[in-house]
């Protein structure tokens, strides 16, 4: 299986990237082909809502999403979203990637991809992952992704760890 790991932490050595490294190592040991993409450091601009793509065409923005990431998404069997939780939600960089799914929503929904979520948070209260989980499940449902599971790591306690 081809797996695309979307990493979105600004901290290259933080807990979310440690989770990503462990996932990649395990997947490769099982014979899967894994590609990692650093969403945080890529030039990915937000959707401008111009609707020129019509949910099926190329995006008018010629950034790393349109020229690199979109092709990787199309080629993969599974997307793995890796992120620290920021204020009880998804980081802007990863949310921007999902917003840009709009440019090929129809095509992407018929690809029936698999998805997983690996996330960490400073906080370890009962509510820290509520919004994150709800959004992930909604995206899986809407995009017809098969939910392969989540790893939710709370209580990381320092910015260096997330």
Annotated model-derived regions:
Residues 92-93, 106-149:
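Short, glycine-/small-residue-rich phosphate/pyrophosphate-handling segment
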Residues 42-43, 123, 156-157:
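Short, internal active-site loops enriched in acidic
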Residues 1-104, 160:
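N-terminal beta1-alpha1-beta2 submodule of the flavodoxin-like/Rossmannoid cofactor-binding fold
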Residues 8, 39, 119-122, 152-153:
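Cofactor-binding loop segments of dinucleotide-utilizing enzymes, especially the Rossmann-like FAD-
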Residues 1, 24, 29, 138-162:
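Glycine-rich phosphate/pyrophosphate-binding loop and the adjoining helix
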């Amino acid at each position: 299986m081809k797996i695309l790991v979307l990493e979105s932490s600004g901290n290259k050595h933080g807990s979310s990237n440690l989770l990503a490294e462990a996932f990649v190592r395990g997947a490769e040991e099982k014979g899967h082909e894994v590609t990692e993409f650093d969403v945080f450091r890529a030039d990915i601009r937000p959707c401008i809502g111009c609707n020129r793509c019509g949910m099926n065409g190329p995006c008018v923005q010629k950034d790393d999403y349109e020229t690199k990431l979109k092709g990787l998404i199309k080629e993969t069997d599974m997307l793995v979203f890796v992120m620290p939780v920021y204020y009880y939600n998804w980081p802007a960089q990863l949310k921007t990637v999902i917003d840009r799914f709009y440019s090929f929503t129809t095509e992407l929904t018929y690809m029936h991809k698999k998805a997983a979520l690996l996330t960490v948070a400073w906080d370890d209260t009962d509510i820290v992952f509520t919004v994150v989980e709800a959004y992930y499940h909604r995206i899986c449902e809407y995009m017809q992704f098969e939910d392969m599971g989540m790893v939710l790591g709370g209580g990381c306690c320092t910015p260096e760890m997330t």
